[in-house]
Amino acid sequence: VPALHGAPGIYSARYAGRHGDDTANNRKLVAELRGIEQRHAYFYCAMAFLLHAEDPTPILATAAWHGTIVDQAVGNNGFGYDPHFFLPELGKSSALLPATVKNQMSHRGQATAKLIDQLAQLA
């Protein structure tokens, strides 16, 4: 979240202290954004494919999924910050998306598709 200088960042699973406490993590995120108008947020995924541990030319794929953070949790699908991650282009939170749609749109889905495309070009 740029307004929070990149937090929660790589600590997203343990942002509120205990690893995997989605409710506490979301509560802390919303509290820290209280009074902040700029609520842009994004998820980022970086993947690397190596043929072996010393591979000098790994295949890299990255992707970001942009949205905004909303105060009220909406939806029950997904996990983590999904209920508060609002997608303006769809008019809904990522927790309202069916898994098949989320898997295509998300940062992980996009990075995976890019990696598969790069691997296919090698064949």
Feature roles, as predicted:
Residues 1-123:
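Anionic-ligand binding patches
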